[in-house]
């Protein structure tokens, strides 16, 4: 069994027993790891502390993947509840990315995250980038607090793990990831239901995937990139723009791949970078971003900044190729 700082477990367990109200927070544009971690912890509270109340903030009336799996909130949560609650923030590396920003109203805050630490913004934090997913952290936390995993908790954690590890393909997958996954499977949860919720997409989204792939360019140094035009997603019936960086996965000869799209709500260009084994988070940090060693995101004010980033990464690959 993996070891977690015993002082954190002791202090966190005290907080769980002390508070009767919990507001659970995820990052903007929440993915399966964020929602999986939050809903798994909500289910843990409902199972072992049925008298307590917990809500996943921002999941009410949201357009996001996972509606077939996660029981999104049916009502909005008022500020008075948050003010009396322990806020737990999942899978969020910096404060400005917390969905709703209402964690600032909470009586106390806890943050649990597997991204590299960039800032401290909660009263209590457990940050460990050796984990493949925040969902993996939550699974081990529940176990080391002395509780069991049930099939509902397991299904949510599994969704978070398989997406953040890219079905265990990614370099962040470790023996401890497989060890926890084995424990999840022992609960007998319905894997087919999770797989369908995560991977089945409408035909139009598949066409959008093909569109992004058709726009990709590949340099002789092994960089693939695609700039997605403003509003392109609307032609495919997609509800909101997506980074679609996975459209460039698994292309032979490609070492780094990146995409960028225009986010109409914040009026900025949002991009993602991926690689198999080359650290790329430093490139994202140059352009108002960051993330994991092999998976990162960035934010641009102007579209032409994307080509500057592309040039920087391509020059890096050119030098690397010369030295190999």
From Swiss-Prot:
Q: Which GO terms describe its molecular function?
A: nucleic acid binding
Which residue ranges run through the membrane? none
The record's section on InterPro entries has:
DDH_dom, DHH_sf, DHHA1_dom, Oligoribo/pAp-PDE_c-di-AMP_PDE
SUPFAM superfamilies assigned to the protein according to its UniProt record, in alphabetical order = DHH phosphoesterases
Q: Name one Pfam family in it.
A: DHH
For this chain, the family text in UniProt reads: Belongs to the mgp1/MG371 family.
Q: What is this protein called?
A: Uncharacterized protein MG371
